[in-house]
């Protein structure tokens, strides 16, 4: 594995670790009342930084590869994901609620989010490899979440989320 591939895999590992821990536990500065906005902003931040870092790494790897060879290397699942994003784009353009369809109103499930899901799928499918330590990170985050939930059920307010 060359240096660029290792860098891309490391960047993917960091992104996955943050999504499996910090993103799951993030409540934002305003408590539960604005948790959706806080999580969405964190999702955008982590994902855009990851995409930029992965793109820089990928550009170093594919500089010398012919475009035809790249197209032949696309897997069927990747074509399907690209088709899904393209259909979502077409649906957004043809929607009578086009202005709302870009971000997706209050739940933020619009074209931007769907396109980022597609990009994440494509990048992680190519750059990430399964690792046991990522399960440990996820397990630790979920254990902490469960402990906080039990504390709250017992009447505590450990994170100061309630007024």
Give residue ranges: language-model regions.
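Membrane-interfacial helix-loop-helix modules of multi-pass inner-membrane proteins that assemble, modify
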Residues: 92-101, 144-163
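Small-residue-rich segments of transmembrane alpha-helices in multi-pass membrane proteins
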Residues: 117, 141-146
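Mid-sequence acidic-hydrophobic segments that form the walls
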Residues: 114-121, 126-130, 150-153, 157
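Transmembrane signal-anchor hairpin modules in multi-pass inner-membrane enzymes, especially those
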Residues: 1-96, 101-105, 119, 123-140
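Structural signature of hydrophobic alpha-helical transmembrane segments
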Residues: 44, 107-114
């Amino acid at each position: 594995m060359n240096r660029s591939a290792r860098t891309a895999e490391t960047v993917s590992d960091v992104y996955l670790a943050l999504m499996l821990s910090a993103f799951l536990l993030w409540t934002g500065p305003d408590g539960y009342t604005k948790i959706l906005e806080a999580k969405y902003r964190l999702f955008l931040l982590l994902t855009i930084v990851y995409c930029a870092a992965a793109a820089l790494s990928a550009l170093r790897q594919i500089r010398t590869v012919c475009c035809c060879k790249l197209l032949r290397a696309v897997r069927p699942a990747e074509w399907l994901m690209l088709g899904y994003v393209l259909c979502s784009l077409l649906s957004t353009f043809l929607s009578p609620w086009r202005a709302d369809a870009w971000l997706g109103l209050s739940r933020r499930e619009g074209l931007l989010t769907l396109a980022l899901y597609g990009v994440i799928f494509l990048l992680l499918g190519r750059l990430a490899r399964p690792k046991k330590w990522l399960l440990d990170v996820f397990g630790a985050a979920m254990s902490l979440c469960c402990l906080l939930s039990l504390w709250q059920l017992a009447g505590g307010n450990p994170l100061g989320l309630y007024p």
